From Swiss-Prot:
Has 3 domains, the large (RuvB-L) and small ATPase (RuvB-S) domains and the C-terminal head (RuvB-H) domain. The head domain binds DNA, while the ATPase domains jointly bind ATP, ADP or are empty depending on the state of the subunit in the translocation cycle. During a single DNA translocation step the structure of each domain remains the same, but their relative positions change. Its main location: cytoplasm. The gene is ruvB. The RuvA-RuvB-RuvC complex processes Holliday junction (HJ) DNA during genetic recombination and DNA repair, while the RuvA-RuvB complex plays an important role in the rescue of blocked DNA replication forks via replication fork reversal (RFR). RuvA specifically binds to HJ cruciform DNA, conferring on it an open structure. The RuvB hexamer acts as an ATP-dependent pump, pulling dsDNA into and through the RuvAB complex. RuvB forms 2 homohexamers on either side of HJ DNA bound by 1 or 2 RuvA tetramers; 4 subunits per hexamer contact DNA at a time. One of its GO terms (molecular function) is four-way junction helicase activity. Residues 202-273 are annotated as: Small ATPAse domain (RuvB-S). This is Holliday junction branch migration complex subunit RuvB. It is found in: Cytoplasm. Residues 276-352 are annotated as: Head domain (RuvB-H). Residues 13-201 are annotated as: Large ATPase domain (RuvB-L). DNA binds at residues 330, 335. Mg(2+) binds at residue 86. CDD domains: AAA.
Length: 352
């Protein structure tokens, strides 16, 4: 089984200093080339921690495809960044014993780019497209017949010399990953036979992921230390591993040790202005802005202007976790603090 990757999509890598948040689930530049992220990737469903229902469903579909000696149905995976969509896609290729070609939608700029990818596929191979909701319309329309009938309908020439040509394709599997399911057009979405939402991970699952990764990078963490780190990882493995690496840096530089205690975790994260709820300065600034308005509902654009941030960043990066832990609520008139949010920001503003 081989994995062939296209050029990396740099558009999802935050550029400015203020965007490089440790608790942001988007991948950051150094993680694109960090070999540790590849070390920790499981190579079978058995090694993959969490998402039990999805694994069970995929295992049945894969075994059925093998039994019939057919390609797996086209599969769509969606959910927040950092939950393992790419890892699951690669695991499917391992389980199917198929070659997987990896591409990012923003790098597929022209129709001929997707044509080249499709023509390069062989029987039973897998094409994985990350951020598939960002495909342009012309490219997306070429996928309709490719997915449904395994053929490409191309128009060659122009004006009176134009002619249609149909190219048959081998039976392949398209796996799409997206953080924005609603942004995928209905015709494309309906052509996926399997569609799964990747859920946030429990603290116990994150604890096991942290423990496994700490062994791989020669760190000694006891159960309590793993549990402490899991609780502030926002249910996201990518954040958990990123925080663990920053704790490792602190322990090795400041304490000259590879043994991680709860005390070291607290001091390391405190140096990064991350508290025991996993919130950083951006989160606290968001909550403080709501409090300053006497808890009257505020529109997202007004909050973004007041904070000097983009409204889309606040909506898709900051808000989901604050809503998940019950600190803010969305109303028809805007955002406002809950009683938990008021209590938190009142007790933490002095410290930070």
């Amino acid at each position: 089984m081989a994995i062939i990757s296209s050029s990396l999509d740099e558009s999802n890598i935050p550029r400015s200093r203020k965007e490089l948040r440790l608790v942001d689930s988007k991948i950051i530049a150094d993680e694109k080339i960090n070999k540790n992220l590849n070390i920790v990737r499981p190579t079978s469903f058995k090694e993959f921690i969490g998402q039990e229902q999805i694994k069970s469903s995929l295992k049945i579909a894969i075994d059925a495809s093998k039994y019939r000696k057919e390609a797996l149905e086209h599969t769509l995976l969606y959910g927040q960044p950092g939950l393992g969509k790419t890892t699951l896609a690669l695991l499917i290729s391992y389980e199917m014993n198929s070659k997987c070609r990896v591409a990012s939608a923003p790098s597929i700029e022209r129709p001929r780019d997707i044509v080249g990818l499709l023509l390069g596929l062989k029987e039973g191979e897998i094409l994985f497209i990350d951020e598939i909701h960002r495909l342009n319309k012309l490219t997306e329309e070429l996928l309709y017949s490719a997915m449904e009938d395994f053929r490409l309908d191309l128009t060659m020439g122009a004006n009176r010399g134009a002619r249609c040509r149909t190219i048959n394709l081998p039976k392949f599997t398209l796996i799409g990953a997206t953080t924005k399911l609603a942004s995928i057009s209905a015709p494309l979405r309906d052509r996926f036979g399997l569609c799964h939402k990747i859920e946030f991970y429990s603290n116990d699952e994150l604890k096991q992921i942290i423990f496994n990764f700490s062994n791989l990078i020669n760190l000694q963490l006891d159960s309590d230390a793993c549990c402490s780190l899991a609780k502030i990882s926002r249910g996201t493995p990518r954040i958990a591993l990123r925080l663990l690496k920053r704790v490792r840096d602190y322990a090795q530089v400041m304490k000259k040790t590879n043994k991680i205690s709860i005390e070291i975790i607290e001091k390391a994260l405190d140096s990064q202005k991350i508290d025991n709820r996993g919130l950083d300065n951006v989160d606290r600034k968001f909550l403080s802005f709501l409090k300053l308005n006497n808890n009257n509902p505020i529109g997202l654009d007004s909050i973004a202007a007041g904070m000097g941030e983009e409204s889309s960043m606040l909506e898709f990066v900051v808000e989901p976790y604050l809503i998940q832990i019950g600190f803010i609520m969305r109303t028809p008139r805007g955002r406002k603090l809950t009683s938990l949010g008021k209590k938190y920001i009142s007790s933490n503003n002095e410290k930070y």
